[in-house]
Amino acid sequence: TENIYFALNSSAIRNEEKMKIEKLAEFMKEHTECNITISGYADKQTGNADINMRLSKKRAENVATQLKEMGIDSQRITVDYKGDTVQPFSTREENRVSICIAE
């Protein structure tokens, strides 16, 4: 699992997180049997449920778009988003996209 962290109330991928996506793209090019699920999350303590659902969706879609632009076939990418309805992480880490790699 790889995590891409976002600033509060933002779906923009920070420069320091882009390197993680680049490494993931290289891994996927080397391991063509692997697929990924990208799950977006948002912080329940900010915004409302509607806003947080849209924000988590946009975060996940932005990561997927970056991977596609790096040559990863969209058939290998599943996008999922949870808004603030699922909180498996501590508060500081809720503003993230979690990427699960499967063979």
Q: What do the PLM-derived regions correspond to, one by one?
A:
Residues 1-27, 42-50:
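Short, solvent-exposed beta-strand/turn patches at coil↔beta or beta↔helix junctions
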Residues 2, 9, 32-34, 75, ...:
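Envelope-exposed proteins and targeting segments
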Residues 15-18, 41-103:
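Periplasmic OmpA-like peptidoglycan-binding domain that tethers envelope proteins to the cell wall
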Residues 27-30, 66:
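Alpha-helical scaffold elements within enzyme catalytic domains, especially in hydrolases
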Residues 29-32, 71:
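Secondary-structure transition/hinge residues
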Residues 38:
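Conserved phosphate/oxyanion-binding catalytic-loop motifs
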